[in-house]
């Protein structure tokens, strides 16, 4: 049975190498997140200060995947 991913909103606070970012969630937790494959394929740029939507797995809440960038 596949576990459901947790979706959360956050703000990019730092850019790390290899399209990895430090994101501060709305509840003030800081997670490390990378870009999803579709965002990478469509060359969507993410800058510091952007509002993003993340997917977190229930197994490791310190890492996530950026699935959407808000305008």
Curated annotation (Swiss-Prot):
Residues 1-71 form the S1-like domain. SUPFAM superfamilies: Nucleic acid-binding proteins (SSF50249). The keyword Cytoplasm applies. Its main location: cytoplasm. The keyword Cell membrane does not apply. Keywords: Cytoplasm, Initiation factor, Protein biosynthesis, RNA-binding, rRNA-binding. It comes from the Bacteria. One of its GO terms (cellular component) is cytosol. InterPro entries: NA-bd_OB-fold, RNA-binding_domain_S1_IF1, S1_domain, TIF_IF1. One of its GO terms (molecular function) is ribosome binding. Pfam families: eIF-1a (PF01176). Signal peptide: none annotated. It is found in: Cytoplasm. One of the essential components for the initiation of protein synthesis. Stabilizes the binding of IF-2 and IF-3 on the 30S subunit to which N-formylmethionyl-tRNA(fMet) subsequently binds. Helps modulate mRNA selection, yielding the 30S pre-initiation complex (PIC). Upon addition of the 50S ribosomal subunit IF-1, IF-2 and IF-3 are released leaving the mature 70S translation initiation complex. Belongs to the IF-1 family. Component of the 30S ribosomal translation pre-initiation complex which assembles on the 30S ribosome in the order IF-2 and IF-3, IF-1 and N-formylmethionyl-tRNA(fMet); mRNA recruitment can occur at any time during PIC assembly. This is Translation initiation factor IF-1. It comes from Buchnera aphidicola subsp. Cinara cedri (strain Cc). The gene is infA.
């Amino acid at each position: 049975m596949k576990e459901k991913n947790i979706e959360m909103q956050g703000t990019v606070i730092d850019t790390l190498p290899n399209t990895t970012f430090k994101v501060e969630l709305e509840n003030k937790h800081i997670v490390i997140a990378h870009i999803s494959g579709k965002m990478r394929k469509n060359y969507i740029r993410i800058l510091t200060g952007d509002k993003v939507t993340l997917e977190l797995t229930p197994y490791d809440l310190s890492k996530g995947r950026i699935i959407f960038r808000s305008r």
